[in-house]
């Protein structure tokens, strides 16, 4: 079978090192591992899925792809899908909340010693995930942002290392702040618009709540205007 990958997952695929042994957590239909093998970019993969329906769908797709000898589909929760003996070098976790991704990593962090790269694609709470990476000895070496079906997705590529981030970098992303892509600006301009609507609904007498929202708006404007 030939997999038509969404642009969101194609962007993730660009960060997978050639020759990697991949674990794709929450693999759903196993589209990403199949695509990477079709392109000759990885040597093997584990497709981990915790829900029975998507697990069975992944099994069927792997069978149709002819990659049964290269992709092992496992019904397991998070990093429980692999053991050190699997020699996984790269882990992808995509399309989940940042807090959930952090919880998945935390539950299996003892297994991360031999893993070279994490490729993470949260769709919210990105700051929670960056904090987890800081606290657990990972450095974000690359970031990107894209939009698909009206949602914004950030990609974080992390490897073992030391990282110190400012409060703004934790919230907005150290590389994304520097790059200031059009999508990044659109995401945060939309957030300003939401906050301004919220501000308009707060009575003038409620100065505490108004000041909190005004501070958030000011911080975003500073980032978009390159004020450190």
Model-predicted regions and their roles:
Residues 1-19, 34, 56-86:
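S-adenosyl-L-methionine
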Residues 87-95:
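Short SAM/SAH-binding signature in class I
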Residues 19-28:
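Conserved class I S-adenosyl-L-methionine
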Residues 2-5, 99-228:
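Class I S-adenosyl-L-methionine
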Residues 53:
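Conserved Rossmann-like nucleotide-cofactor binding loop
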Residues 29-42:
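Conserved SAM-binding loop of SAM-dependent methyltransferases across substrates and taxa
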Residues 44-49:
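Conserved SAM-binding motif I beta-strand of class I
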